[in-house]
Amino acid sequence: MNNITLAPVQTDQPSHLMPVFGRQPISFVRGRGSYLYTEDGTEYFDALTGIAVCGLGHAHPVIAEAIAEQAATLIHTSNLFEVPWQTAAAQKLAEVAGMEEVFFSNSGAESNEGAIKIARKFGYMQGIANPKIIVAEHSFHGRTMATLSATGNKKVQEGFGPLVEGFIRVPFGDIEAIEEAAIHHPDIVAIFVEPIQGEGGVNTAPQGFSYLEEIRQICNQHNWLMMLDEVQTGNGRTGEYF
């Protein structure tokens, strides 16, 4: 079924891919369960899982069957029409999240970009001309311009200025800093944090998840949105679905 011939990795040859990733000189051609294989059959244990997106393993028979069945039935019609599988998936996600509505996107960055837009729209609806969002130091929210600007890592921001304005940065886990920001910035509309910081070093707040409970209370007090970036922690990666 697959007649594509894959050439071995040649590190001394020019690549047509833009050099934006620090890639290792190795190429995988297939996977099975927790293992990856090169063209010559060398087996590697996959502890990276596609940066946490292949947690159910490679070539899982149930997933492969579902993808093949859907591809043979219907791939895409656009959001201009009702898609029953999409509706069913949204219902499931809403149930496990304890929420009412779902917006599907193509990436973590697009999801976070959408969250930032929702926060700004929320502010504009209240007559706030320049809404601000509180974000955390050492965070990572994506590489689009808005999510890059929300990210608390100068290394990934370098060379892409001027950044998008409207973000107030506080130390991760510091409730007092959030309360202080509330005093000096009456135009805050949301707090945007990762429950556990991923790229920043797998950081948890010193006070544990009571940090999120305190954020919830502050958001209720000030009528702010509480937005959680669970691109890395969601979908069961911590033992809880969210």
What do the PLM-derived regions correspond to, one by one?
Residues 2-242:
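Conserved N-terminal phosphate-binding loop of PLP-dependent enzymes in the Aspartate aminotransferase
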